[in-house]
Structures are given as structure tokens and as C-alpha cells.
Swiss-Prot record:
Protein name (record): Collagen alpha-1(II) chain
UniProtKB keywords: Calcium, Cataract, Collagen, Deafness, Disease variant, Disulfide bond, Dwarfism, Extracellular matrix, Glycoprotein, Hydroxylation, Metal-binding, Repeat, Secreted, Signal, Stickler syndrome
Disease tied to this protein: Spondyloepiphyseal dysplasia congenital type: Disorder characterized by disproportionate short stature and pleiotropic involvement of the skeletal and ocular systems.
Domain Fibrillar collagen NC1: 1253-1487
UniProt effect for mutating G1170S: In ANFH1 and LCPD
Signal peptide per UniProt: 1-25
Free-text domain note: The C-terminal propeptide, also known as COLFI domain, have crucial roles in tissue growth and repair by controlling both the intracellular assembly of procollagen molecules and the extracellular assembly of collagen fibrils. It binds a calcium ion which is essential for its function.
Effect of substituting G891R: In ACG2 and SEDC
Summary of subunit composition and partner proteins: Homotrimers of alpha 1(II) chains.
Length: 1487
């Protein structure tokens, strides 16, 4: 074990401090450091400002304490070393290098072998030596004192063997066979004694069976056994002689009912019976045919905008839109790149003749001939040179159409078209087949108890039953004859007090006592049997029509009506949330095989199927080839420490180390096992007579001696103190009956008697009114599964399903070729069940069945009338001895027992209470005066002191200023119930009720003769008050009483700081479209656009009109006249001319129609604050509020100075043996001190107390920190989790503001709340706490609806909670944790109104204009409806429009903490110019 000196201990403790403390979020250097005498110390530093004073820095506070020195005894000249406080005794050891340390407790004997130390002083007397040789026989001793009483004698001769006893319990496990292996461990010399370590060996084999033991002693006399079970019946005896005739028997039972007579004729129809109980619901019918489609319903209201859907697949291309208006001419574009060469045109007509060619060489001179006759045409000459290209010809006629081109690539899908209007209703389809059998309906409500059945005919006799269970013990047998007298027994111990003796005869009649207080009312007697029905009264005059009543409770479900005709289709409802999928019904029975249907049309390709289940794992493959060696990976992170390895082999012996510092005193070790007894020593020489010893401790109590003879009668002693009451004695026998007592004085007035027993049932009462419908019973457990019922009639046609949304278009399939007809298919699965056939004709009546089994026992009959009281019976025998009396008072303490065996060392106990302060030490020397410390934080308020004597009355002071009126107090507890009032007069007639459900149609009555109309009778007199009706349900909590007298005017409050700008509200509704603005001026011409990218080549345009003839070319040199050519063909078309300049702008177009209103813009900034209104009149003073919250508890005071040193610790465990081999060669020394000197002297050295003072201070600081975690204070530095935790830790604290941190962790996000210490509630303040009173909403709409303040009203806001200094999301997180830690929440809201109704509308008498409030989980909480979502009004001062301010206080309580706090409020009765409101938001409280 490592022994630590004080410095190491401090380091460890400092680390421990750091680990225990939670994050306080403070900079160590700044917040936790301390300054003393101009010197800065870090948190947890320990220093000595002077030798006898020690200080520690504890989170910014300096704690100092004086060092207390112990006396240095047996020292002639103690010295105080430099810088130390306590004196030590110097030694004369000049050669030692240092002062010797303090001596430890005496160690156990070490293990020193064969080392001769220096000669020591003579030792103390050694232990007794080994046993010597036997000594001579001594003289005869004196007669001893009489010995203790001998044991009982040997038992008598054994009796006859008893019957074998029951098998005994299993014996303890035997020792194993190899006992030698269990003797492990030997002696542990360090502990100072031998320890026998018994280790369990393996179980040995079973030994041979032992011989039978000796016969046991005869058992005691057994108790009388229970009477045996009755024996089997004996064999029947012979027939006896015929007896005399008996007396006539009792009249026999009624015979069985005769067979029913023939049916009588049908009587006239009786009056309509009372409405029967509803029948049990029928089984669900078979699904009916599909109904005809209903008419289109009216268009439903627009649904709330849905969540944005996923992007749809692209729709098909839309049809081309209409042609737009002609645009303005654009700027002239840049010259485009040259187009591709056009197709070759048709040949043009030949152009005009070209200019004459050059002059040819002169021909030979011809002969001038006369003109000859015209010759024939010569052969065609050679082709002349090609002329220039002529102008372009006219376009040719269009060619015939070319072959069809290849299909283009599919275009991209167009945008989805608008949803088509609903189509006309389709032709009604053929009726569908009945659907499969539906799943069984839910278990119907249990029907009412049916009427009692008629008594069944007696059943056949049953078989003989099995043997019944053993009967209970029979009555005790008759008293046996008295046995012989036994020997006289010893006198028994005193019996318990006897039971009460029989009652003595009554005493004389006492004088009457004073009148007692009236007893409490007795319990109501049981309700009498119902009286017989009285005769019908005369019909009263017809009353006036009453006002419509409140809606009645829903009646019981009526009998099933006839199937109605299908109703008109209702308007399309909003899409409900999708329900949870129902459980699969049981498959119906297979129907008969239907005829084979026609082959269906080929369906659209189905949606992609769900992924299949994963396939079974394949068989294990062959192992793959080994892969290539991978690259070396990055170095891994350092792994966690591995488990400790096995112990290595022992190393070589190290050198002797230097002696370490002495350790702290250890705890005492467990006591060692007792050593073996030593052998008896030799008889020693008789010593001299010793001096008389001190009186020894009191010995253990000896065995009692034999009884001495009685002593002489002593003197009368003084009266002893009363002893402690003894234990209960055994019960004594009953005493004889006492004589009758004398007449007593009249008794005191008695206490009110207990509530009397229930009275005898009264006479049969009148039939009671029909009771109110009871609350809905808890659902019964599911019944067992019933048998399958018969198929019910078809149900009514279901309503039309909603039209499904258009599915995405599937990919177009290619048209398949018509397939060849297939082979005949296999028989199809059985078709659905056919329609139910018509019922068959009635069958013949069956043969009479066998006699049925005995019916169940009928219900118990109504109890008969009570018989007359019987005469008193004779006095019964003396009762059984009563139960044992109550436990007596505690007896005197018994004699001291023998000391028990030493227990195991227990675990260390928890810290004890601090001991009483020690005596004050001697005052130290006065130190220099320290600098004035910083003022400490204020301490906690002290406990109130004892009340001092009353001072003289002071003079009358001046009257103080009026205090501000407090906040409104919570409603007081409910008062005690008042006395029962007189039965009231009948109430006013209720409002007219809503019509009930239609009853079943009765049979038509006969036509009555019209009666003459009677005169209206006079109203009857008011009847006597009726009997008290049954107790109604408790009413709603009454509204609070009227305001108390007004309090004194409070002083005017200081004007509050300007609030921060509220959060941006939701955008307002769009305004009406504005009038169109004037046309703007023509804009400047824009910069020239860049050249566009080259477009794709367009199709050839139509042929243009013929171009204008080009200008005349320059005149050529005159040629010689050529031969006239033929007329040339038309030339090519000229090039297009340049684009002209842009024309002037056209006139302005007509004004366009006004466009649709754009979306509303973002909310504008809040307008400037308007001028202040006139000061309002002073309000009525509010009621006096509850006491204000408790102030913040002070910060923790500084830790006190360290306490006085504790008592010395227990001695440490035995030290290890010292290896003395280092001293082996010393031998006897001539010079110098004995090296073992310090190992010998047995006086304990004085401890060095100052080393422990530093540790004490650190531990005290640590203890404070841990204590603050275990018991939080509710301060900002040490917040609690909830106020309930604070109340548990500090039940005496008062209600007030405290800090809590529900999410724990760092305390920087703690929040300030109000703790109600009476209830443990945690109340979080709203921020801000009110909505100013003003006109918040103006609306000209006649239609009133609820307007949410935070969501709809301009400038409104959702209510938020928590501190100003907390971010809103931090407060929300804390509230979430607070809700999780709580089981109930409540909150009040005060609505200030001016001409606005908050709860009850007094004029209309209903709650339709009541406020709505919104919980934090967005649930709406109303004034009426489901009780889980309704609030209550504690005070309602806003029931009508008075033109003055009033207020209504509403409260909502729920165990669903997620609904609180309230985050928004919606009034309905607002919007007018005179209607104003404001809200005070109360704190939300969780418990």
C-alpha cells in the first residue's frame, strides 16, 4: 500500500475537489481566487500567514484557523523550530542528519530470524514456559465449596419403540473426502496468530448405511383426533315387518302444468305498451349491392391549405395558345452568319444576246452571186459558248408530298392540365355481387337482464356424484367420565386476569342525567319497497308552450328502424385523417363455384410491387483465395487499459530502501482469531503475597445457587418506588358476580352519540321518477368469442366514396397483337356467395323432444315482509373464554446476558453529529492586525431569538403612506357545508327540450269521435313542496363572492420602461385593388443587345414577291451589231434590301383590365406611437392581494473556521515485519547511540498537528460543496431542480422567488420562479405579464367569430414565459423538463373587458361568445363541451355591455401538463369601435 505524505494527499484532494464540483461557469483566476495582505491566492490554495495560523482559499473566501499544539510531556527543554508553531523535544543524537519522526503505534511482533542485535536492557517477565516434569504430589487441599447442581440422571429404560416418525429435513452437507487439502493457509505471522483457512474440497463418495439407532423414548400423549369420516353404508338389512299406517301426509306439490289449450281468437289490439328496452344489436348484415351514384353534392368549403405535395410528373404538352398581339419592331440585328446553300433552282430562261464577239479573220473574197433561191435548212451548227446567267425564274408548282419521315424523339411532357370538372353521372352499373362477409362487429353492450324464465320441467335424476371433500370436524363428543386424580402439581405461576364475570343484577335506577347533545343523523334507512301504482289523476288543462329546453342527454339507442331510402349525397366533407388500419377479418366460408366470367380487358400495368422478402441464406461458399496484403493502416487511438495481467515471477530482492515518512494512523484491524491455548507451564515457585488488587470489574452472573433456608423476618423497609409494569400474566379464572351497586350520582352530559344503526325499512315508497342517465360505465372485459350468427339482412347502401385523385400517367404501352385464343383454363376458385335465396316453406312440426335437463336455479325471490320480533330466548351458557388481554406495560429489564461473539467489522457509519466543543485552548500570542477584509455576503437569517421583555410603549408615530395594493389572492378554501335548507318551491319551468329521437311507429288507433273543445280550466293551487329529490350531481364551482370593501388607494406606480418591439405579426388580409396609375413616360432607348446565338436552320419560307428591277448598268463600248437573239428567260431574284429604320412609336393602347390582386406584401414597420390618450379615471381598487413572494434566500455564508481537532484515531493495523538484515553486522556498539533506540521506548511521541490542519480546511470546503449539491438552496449559484425538491429539503422555508434548473447541467440557464412552499408548486412568470387595455380589433363584418390575439390581431403576440435574461428557446427547454417532472398544472388568466363578453352572455343566457384559449400543444380549450378541454370561470364580470371596464378570471387545471402554459387567447365579442379589452396573464404553476 502506498503511503502518502501530506503534499501528495493535498494534490489528490485538490483533484477530488475539481471532480466533485459542478461547472460553475466562473473564471478560476477571477471568480475563485482570494486576496489577503496584497497577495493573490488561487482557489483551494493553503498557506500560513504566520507560524500558528493556517488559511485556505475557498471559492473566493479566505478561511483561517489557529493551529492548536499538544503538550510536550517528559521533555526538559522543548524547542520551537524556526517557522513552526509547536514545540518539539530535541534529542541528543548529534550524528543523525535529521530530527527523528514521531513514533508510531506499537506494531505487532515482527519476523526476525537469526540476527543478533546489541544487548538490550532486561526485558519484562516472559510468558509461561513449556510444561516441566511432573512435580511431587501436593498436600491434600481444603474441602471445596459445594458444587453446582448436578445434571439430570440417566434416562430410564427405553419404552417400546414408537411408530416411525416423518422423514427429517435434509442434513447439512458433509465434509468432503480430502480433508487434508482444506487445511490451507497455515499461520499468518503478521497478524499475530494462526488462521485456519478451510477450503471446501470435492464431495466424497456416499458412506455405507449406518446401523439402526436405539429406540426413541415413548412420545407424549397425543391430542384427541378429529372424528373420522363417515363409513361406507352397510349392507342393507332384511325387510322389516309392515308398520302401522302413518298419519295423513301433507298436501302434495302442485302438479305439472297441463298442456296448453287451443289458441283463443285474436283479441282487440291493446293500448300501446311502454317503450321496450332496446334489443341487442343485430349482427352486421351482408354487404348490400353497390348503390346508385348520388347527385353531385354542393361544393364544400375550401379546405385548409394542404402541405405542399411532391412534384408531379410532367404533363403532356398543352395546346398552343392564341396568337399574341404584334410586338413593336425590334432594332436592326447584326448581320447574321451566311446561311447554308439553298437548293438548286429551276433553269431560268435564256438571257439576252451577249455583246458581239471579237472580229474574226477576214474571209476569202466571195463571188458576188445573185441571190439564189432559198435553200433548205442547213445542219445544226456547233453549240455556241454559254451565255451569262439569266434572271431567276418564277417559282414552280409545289411538288408531290415526300414519303413520311421517321418518327421524331418524343417531346418533353407538358405542364399538367387543370383538373377537369366532374363528369356527368355514369349509367348505373349492374348490381354487384354481395361482398365477402365482414369481420365480426364490436362486442355489443350487454343487454338488460331478461325476464325470469318459467320454471323448467324437472330433469332426469343425475348420476351419483364423486365422493365429497372431508367434512368439517363434528361437534365435540359428550364429556367423558372424570379420570383418576393426578399427583399434586407444583404451584402454578400467577394466572392472567380472568375474563369478565357474568353481569351482576342491575343497580337501582340512577337519577336522570343532563340532556346530551343531539346525535348525528342516522344513516338513511334502506329504500322501501316500491308502492303500488296510484290511480291516474284527472287530466290537467293544457299548459302553455314552454321555452325550448336545453338539449337532453342522448336517449338509449332505439330499436333498429327500417332501412331508409338512400339519402341525397351530402356535401363533400374535408378529408379526414387516415384511420388506423383495421385488423384483418376472418376469411369467410368459400361460396359455391360461379360461372366462368368473360375475359377482362387488359389492365394498365400495375404499380411496382413491394420488395420481396429476403431470400434464404445460400449455402456456405468455398473459401476465397487469400487477398493481397493491405497497406498499413493509420495508427489507432490509444486503446483502453487492458485487464491486469497475471502476477509476474517474483523479482530479485531489491536493495534496502530509505525509510519512508511515517503514514497516517490507520483504522483498527479486525480482531484476530483466538490463538491456540499454550501448554501448561511448570509449577512456579510460590511468589510472595501480593498487595491487595484493585476492585475487579463485576463478574458475569453465576448460575443460581440452591435455594437457601428462609431468613428471619426483616424490618419493614421503606416504601419502594413503583416498579415498571410487568408483562401480561396468564388469564385468571372468572370472578364471581358482584353484588348490585349502589345508586350512582347522575352522570355528566354525554357526548353526542355515534350515528345510529340503519332504521327498519320504511313502508313501500311511491314509485320514484325515472333516474338520470348514469355515467357511462367502464367498458366491460371482452367477452368470449360467440358462435357465428346467421347472416343478417343486407345493410343500407353506403355513401358514395370520394373521387380518387388522378394518378400519374403510366408509360404508353405498345399495342400488342391480338393473341391466339388460349386453351381452356383450369376450374376457377369458388366464386363469391350468391344472393340469399327466398325462405323455404315452413316445415312440419318435429317430434316432441326428450325431457330437458334441469334448468338453472331461478333468481332469488323478493324478500318477504319482516316477521314480528321473537320472544327473548333463555339465557345462554357461559361464553368461551374471551381473547387474550391487551399487552401489558413493559416489564423490568432482564439480567445482563452473556457477551455475544465478536461481530464482523461493520461498514463505516455515516458521519456522526459533531461532538461537543472541546475546552478552549490557551490563547495564542496576539498577531499583527490583518488588513480589513472585504465585507462578506450577508448570512442567512438567524433563528428568531427568545422573546424579550416588553419595552415601554413608544410614542405614537405619524401615519405611514398607504402601501400598494397587493395582487389578487387565490380563492380561499371551501367553507364548511351549511345546514340543510328548507325544501324550496318548485323551480321555473325549464326551456323547451330538443325533440327526442323518433319512436317506433305504433299500430294505427281507431278513429276517435271529435270531442268538443272544453273551456280552459283555472290554474290549480300550488301543490305542497315535494319530497326531497335524489341528490343532484355537484354543481360547477360557484363564482366567487362579491368584492370586499375597497382597499385604500395605492400610490401611483412608476412609469414602466418602454417595451421592446413586438415580434412581426402574421401578414394581414389583402387590401382591395387600387385604381390604375397614370401611364408612365416613354423610357429611354435601351442599349443594343448582343448578337444572339445562331438559331437552328428554319424551314424554307414561301416564295417572295418578285423583286424590283435593278438599276441600269453603265453603258458598254458599242459593239458591232450582232444578230438579234431570241427573247431571254427571266433572271434570278435579287438580294433582299437592307432593313429600314425603326418607325415612330404607335399610339398608346387601351387601358388593360385590372390584374388580380398580388400577394400581400411583407408586414410594414410598426407605425409611430400615437399621442398618449387622456388619463383614465382611477380604477376601482383591487382586492387585497396575497402576501408577496419570499425574498431571495441569501447567498451561502462563508465557511466557518476549521473545527477543533478530532479525538485521536484508533490504533492502526499491525505493521509488517521489519527486515533487520541491514543491521545484522553491527554487533555490540561501543560508540554512538543504539540504532534501534527508537524502536524500543514505549512512550508515544506528540503528533504533529499542523500537517493535518491543511487537510482539515480542504475537507471542510469539500464537505460544504457536496452538502450544497445534496441539499440545494434555490439560489442562482445553487439552484434546485423544482420547488418540490426545495420543499422536501427545507420544509420550513417560506414561499417566495427561488432559482430552479429543471434540466440540471450547467447552472447558467437556471430561471427564477415563485415557489409555493405550502403546496410545493413551481410557478413560472409570463414575460410580458399583460396585454395593454385598448381597442385591438376593428371589423365591419356582421358575422362574429373568434379572433386569435397572437395569430390574427395586428400587434398581438403569443404569450411567452421565463426570465428576461433567458433566451426563449432556453426557457422552452426548461419548461419541457418541468412538465416532465410534474403531474398537474394550473393557470389563471384575467380578461379585462369594456363592452366585450368574456364567458356568459347574460342577454342570451349561453356561453356561445365565451373566450377560447390555446394550450402550448395547440389544443383549444373552451368554456363548454368535453370536460377535459374546458376551463372554469372563477369570477365573471363581463356578462353585458355597460360601457365600463370589468374583468373575468378564468382558470384551467389539467393533469396533462403538455397543455400548459396558455399561449394565446381568442375573444369573439370584439371588433366594434367601443369594444376594448386587455389581458393579465397569471403564472403557470406545476406540481
Amino acid at each position: 500500500m502506498i503511503r502518502l505524505g501530506a503534499p501528495q494527499t493535498l494534490v489528490l484532494l485538490t483533484l477530488l475537489v475539481a471532480a466533485v464540483l459542478r461547472c460553475q461557469g466562473q473564471d478560476v483566476q477571477e471568480a475563485g481566487s482570494c486576496v489577503q495582505d496584497g497577495q493573490r491566492y488561487n482557489d483551494k490554495d493553503v498557506w500560513k500567514p504566520e507560524p500558528c495560523r493556517i488559511c485556505v482559499c475557498d471559492t473566493g473566501t479566505v478561511l483561517c484557523d489557529d493551529i492548536i499544539c499538544e503538550d510536550v510531556k517528559d521533555c526538559l527543554s522543548p524547542e520551537i523550530p524556526f517557522g513552526e508553531c509547536c514545540p518539539i523535544c530535541p534529542t541528543d543524537l548529534a550524528t543523525a542528519s535529521g530530527q527523528p519522526g514521531p513514533k508510531g503505534q506499537k506494531g505487532e511482533p515482527g519476523d526476525i530470524k537469526d540476527i543478533v542485535g546489541p544487548k538490550g536492557p532486561p526485558g519484562p517477565q516472559g510468558p509461561a514456559g513449556e510444561q516441566g516434569p511432573r512435580g511431587d504430589r501436593g498436600d491434600k487441599g481444603e474441602k471445596g465449596a459445594p458444587g453446582p447442581r448436578g445434571r439430570d440422571g440417566e434416562p430410564g429404560t427405553p419404552g417400546n419403540p414408537g411408530p416411525p416418525g416423518p422423514p427429517g429435513p435434509p442434513g447439512p452437507p458433509g465434509l468432503g473426502g480430502n480433508f487434508a487439502a482444506q487445511m490451507a493457509g497455515g499461520f499468518d505471522e503478521k497478524a499475530g496468530g494462526a488462521q485456519l483457512g478451510v477450503m471446501q474440497g470435492p464431495m466424497g463418495p456416499m458412506g455405507p448405511r449406518g446401523p439402526p439407532g436405539p429406540a426413541g423414548a415413548p412420545g407424549p400423549q397425543g391430542f384427541q383426533g378429529n372424528p373420522g369420516e363417515p363409513g361406507e353404508p352397510g349392507v342393507s338389512g332384511p325387510m322389516g315387518p309392515r308398520g302401522p299406517p302413518g298419519p295423513p301426509g301433507k298436501p302434495g306439490d302442485d302438479g305439472e302444468a297441463g298442456k296448453p289449450g287451443k289458441a283463443g281468437e285474436r283479441g282487440p289490439p291493446g293500448p300501446q305498451g311502454a317503450r321496450g328496452f332496446p334489443g341487442t344489436p343485430g349482427l352486421p348484415g351482408v354487404k348490400g349491392h353497390r348503390g346508385y351514384p348520388g347527385l353531385d353534392g354542393a361544393k364544400g368549403e375550401a379546405g385548409a391549405p394542404g402541405v405542399k405535395g411532391e412534384s408531379g410528373s410532367p404533363g403532356e404538352n398543352g395546346s398552343p395558345g392564341p396568337m399574341g398581339p404584334r410586338g413593336l419592331p425590334g432594332e436592326r440585328g447584326r448581320t447574321g452568319p451566311a446561311g447554308a446553300a439553298g437548293a438548286r433552282g429551276n433553269d431560268g430562261q435564256p438571257g439576252p444576246a451577249g455583246p458581239p464577239g471579237p472580229v474574226g479573220p477576214a474571209g476569202g473574197p466571195g463571188f458576188p452571186g445573185a441571190p439564189g433561191a432559198k435553200g433548205e435548212a442547213g445542219p445544226t451548227g456547233a453549240r455556241g459558248p454559254e451565255g451569262a446567267q439569266g434572271p431567276r425564274g418564277e417559282p414552280g408548282t409545289p411538288g408531290s408530298p415526300g414519303p413520311a419521315g421517321a418518327s421524331g424523339n418524343p417531346g418533353t411532357d407538358g405542364i399538367p392540365g387543370a383538373k377537369g370538372s366532374a363528369g356527368a353521372p355514369g349509367i348505373a352499373g349492374a348490381p354487384g355481387f354481395p361482398g365477402p362477409r365482414g369481420p365480426p362487429g364490436p362486442q355489443g353492450a350487454t343487454g338488460p337482464l331478461g325476464p325470469k324464465g318459467q320454471t323448467g320441467e324437472p330433469g332426469i335424476a343425475g348420476f351419483k356424484g364423486e365422493q365429497g371433500p372431508k367434512g368439517e370436524p363434528g361437534p365435540a363428543g359428550p364429556q367423558g367420565a372424570p379420570g383418576p386424580a393426578g399427583e399434586e402439581g407444583k404451584r402454578g405461576a400467577r394466572g392472567e386476569p380472568g375474563g369478565v364475570g357474568p353481569i351482576g343484577p342491575p343497580g337501582e335506577r340512577g337519577a336522570p342525567g343532563n340532556r346530551g347533545f343531539p346525535g348525528q343523523d342516522g344513516l338513511a334507512g334502506p329504500k322501501g319497497a316500491p308502492g303500488e301504482r296510484g290511480p291516474s289523476g284527472l287530466a290537467g288543462p293544457k299548459g302553455a308552450n314552454g321555452d325550448p329546453g336545453r338539449p337532453g342527454e342522448p336517449g338509449l339507442p332505439g330499436a333498429r328502424g327500417l332501412t331508409g331510402r338512400p339519402g341525397d349525397a351530402g356535401p363533400q366533407g374535408k378529408v379526414g385523417p387516415s384511420g388506423a388500419p383495421g385488423e384483418d377479418g376472418r376469411p369467410g366460408p368459400p361460396g359455391p363455384q360461379g360461372a366462368r366470367g368473360q375475359p377482362g380487358v387488359m389492365g394498365f400495368p400495375g404499380p411496382k410491387g413491394a420488395n420481396g422478402e429476403p431470400g434464404k441464406a445460400g449455402e456456405k461458399g468455398l473459401p476465397g483465395a487469400p487477398g493481397l496484403r493491405g497497406l498499413p493502416g493509420k495508427d489507432g487511438e490509444t486503446g483502453a487499459a487492458g485487464p491486469p495481467g497475471p502476477a509476474g515471477p517474483a523479482g530479485e530482492r531489491g536493495e534496502q530502501g530509505a525509510p519512508g515518512p511515517s503514514g497516517f494512523q490507520g483504522l483498527p484491524g479486525p480482531p484476530g482469531p483466538p490463538g491456540e491455548g499454550g501448554k501448561p507451564g511448570d509449577q512456579g515457585v510460590p511468589g510472595e503475597a501480593g498487595a491487595p488488587g484493585l476492585v475487579g470489574p463485576r463478574g458475569e452472573r453465576g448460575f443460581p445457587g440452591e435455594r437457601g433456608s428462609p431468613g428471619a423476618q426483616g424490618l419493614q423497609g421503606p416504601r419502594g418506588l413503583p416498579g415498571t409494569p410487568g408483562t401480561d400474566g396468564p388469564k385468571g379464572a372468572s370472578g364471581p358476580a358482584g353484588p348490585p351497586g349502589a345508586q350512582g350520582p347522575p352522570g355528566l352530559q354525554g357526548m353526542p352519540g355515534e350515528r345510529g344503526a340503519a332504521g327498519i325499512a320504511g313502508p313501500k315508497g311511491d314509485r320514484g321518477d325515472v333516474g338520470e342517465k348514469g355515467p357511462e360505465g367502464a367498458p366491460g372485459k371482452d367477452g368470449g368469442r360467440g358462435l357465428t350468427g346467421p347472416i343478417g339482412p343486407p345493410g343500407p347502401a353506403g355513401a358514395n366514396g370520394e373521387k380518387g385523385e388522378v394518378g400519374p400517367p403510366g408509360p404508353a404501352g405498345s399495342a400488342g397483337a391480338r393473341g391466339a385464343p388460349g386453351e381452356r383454363g383450369e376450374t376457377g376458385p369458388p366464386g363469391p356467395a350468391g344472393f340469399a335465396g327466398p325462405p323455404g316453406a315452413d316445415g312440419q312440426p318435429g317430434a316432441k323432444g326428450e325431457q330437458g335437463e334441469a334448468g338453472q336455479k331461478g333468481d332469488a325471490g323478493a324478500p318477504g315482509p319482516q316477521g314480528p320480533s321473537g320472544a327473548p330466548g333463555p339465557q345462554g351458557p357461559t361464553g368461551v373464554t374471551g381473547p387474550k388481554g391487551a399487552r401489558g406495560a413493559q416489564g423490568p429489564p432482564g439480567a445482563t446476558g452473556f457477551p455475544g461473539a465478536a461481530g464482523r467489522v461493520g461498514p463505516p457509519g455515516s458521519n456522526g453529529n459533531p461532538g461537543p466543543p472541546g475546552p478552549p485552548g490557551p490563547s495564542g500570542k496576539d498577531g499583527p492586525k490583518g488588513a480589513r477584509g472585504d465585507s462578506g455576503p450577508p448570512g442567512r437569517a438567524g433563528e428568531p431569538g427568545l422573546q424579550g421583555p416588553a419595552g415601554p410603549p413608544g410614542e405614537k408615530g405619524e401615519p405611514g403612506d398607504d402601501g400598494p395594493s397587493g395582487a389578487e389572492g387565490p380563492p380561499g378554501p371551501q367553507g364548511l357545508a351549511g345546514q340543510r335548507g328548507i325544501v324550496g318551491l318548485p323551480g321555473q319551468r325549464g326551456e323547451r327540450g330538443f325533440p327526442g329521437l323518433p319512436g317506433p311507429s305504433g299500430e294505427p288507433g281507431k278513429q276517435g269521435a271529435p270531442g268538443a273543445s272544453g273551456d280552459r280550466g283555472p290554474p290549480g293551487p300550488v301543490g305542497p313542496p315535494g319530497l326531497t329529490g335524489p341528490a343532484g350531481e355537484p354543481g360547477r364551482e360557484g363564482s366567487p363572492g362579491a368584492d370586499g370593501p375597497p382597499g385604500r388607494d395605492g400610490a401611483a406606480g412608476v412609469k414602466g420602461d418602454r417595451g421592446e418591439t413586438g415580434a412581426v405579426g402574421a401578414p394581414g388580409a389583402p387590401g382591395p385593388p387600387g385604381s390604375p396609375g397614370p401611364a408612365g413616360p416613354t423610357g429611354k432607348q435601351g442599349d443594343r443587345g448582343e448578337a444572339g446565338a445562331q438559331g437552328p436552320m428554319g424551314p424554307s419560307g414561301p416564295a417572295g414577291a418578285r423583286g424590283i428591277q435593278g438599276p441600269q448598268g453603265p453603258r458598254g463600248d458599242k459593239g458591232e451589231a450582232g444578230e438579234p437573239g431570241e427573247r431571254g428567260l427571266k433572271g434570278h431574284r435579287g438580294f433582299t434590301g437592307l432593313q429600314g429604320l425603326p418607325g415612330p412609336p404607335g399610339p398608346s393602347g387601351d387601358q388593360g383590365a385590372s390584374g388580380p390582386a398580388g400577394p400581400s406584401g411583407p408586414r410594414g414597420p410598426p407605425g409611430p406611437v400615437g399621442p398618449s390618450g387622456k388619463d383614465g379615471a382611477n380604477g376601482i381598487p383591487g382586492p387585497i392581494g396575497p402576501p408577496g413572494p419570499r425574498g431571495r434566500s441569501g447567498e451561502t455564508g462563508p465557511a466557518g473556521p476549521p473545527g477543533n481537532p478530532g479525538p485521536p484515531g484508533p490504533p492502526g493495523p499491525p505493521g509488517p515485519g521489519i527486515d533487520m538484515s541491514a543491521f545484522a553486522g553491527l554487533g555490540p556498539r561501543e560508540k554512538g547511540p543504539d540504532p534501534l533506540q527508537y524502536m524500543r521506548a514505549d512512550q508515544a511521541a506528540g503528533g504533529l498537528r499542523q500537517h493535518d490542519a491543511e487537510v482539515d480546511a480542504t475537507l471542510k470546503s469539500l464537505n460544504n460543496q457536496i452538502e450544497s449539491i445534496r441539499s440545494p438552496e434555490g439560489s442562482r449559484k445553487n439552484p434546485a431542480r423544482t420547488c418540490r425538491d426545495l420543499k422536501l429539503c427545507h420544509p420550513e422555508w417560506k414561499s417566495g422567488d427561488y432559482w430552479i434548473d429543471p434540466n440540471q447541467g450547467c447552472t447558467l440557464d437556471a430561471m427564477k420562479v415563485f415557489c409555493n412552499m405550502e403546496t410545493g408548486e413551481t410557478c413560472v412568470y409570463p414575460n410580458p405579464a399583460n396585454v395593454p387595455k385598448k381597442n385591438w380589433w376593428s371589423s365591419k363584418s356582421k358575422e362574429k367569430k373568434h379572433i386569435w390575439f397572437g395569430e390574427t390581431i395586428n400587434g398581438g403576440f403569443h404569450f411567452s414565459y421565463g426570465d428576461d435574461n433567458l433566451a426563449p428557446n432556453t426557457a422552452n427547454v426548461q419548461m419541457t423538463f418541468l412538465r416532465l417532472l410534474s403531474t398537474e398544472g394550473s393557470q389563471n388568466i384575467t380578461y379585462h373587458c369594456k363592452n366585450s363578453i368574456a364567458y356568459l352572455d347574460e342577454a342570451a343566457g349561453n356561453l356561445k361568445k365565451a373566450l377560447l384559449i390555446q394550450g402550448s400543444n395547440d389544443v383549444e380549450i373552451r368554456a363548454e363541451g368535453n370536460s377535459r378541454f374546458t376551463y372554469t370561470a372563477l369570477k365573471d364580470g363581463c356578462t353585458k355591455h355597460t360601457g365600463k371596464w370589468g374583468k373575468t378570471v378564468i382558470e384551467y387545471r389539467s393533469q396533462k401538463t403538455s397543455r400548459l402554459p396558455i399561449i394565446d387567447i381568442a375573444p369573439m365579442d370584439i371588433g366594434g369601435p367601443e369594444q376594448e379589452f386587455g389581458v393579465d396573464i397569471g403564472p403557470v404553476c406545476f406540481l
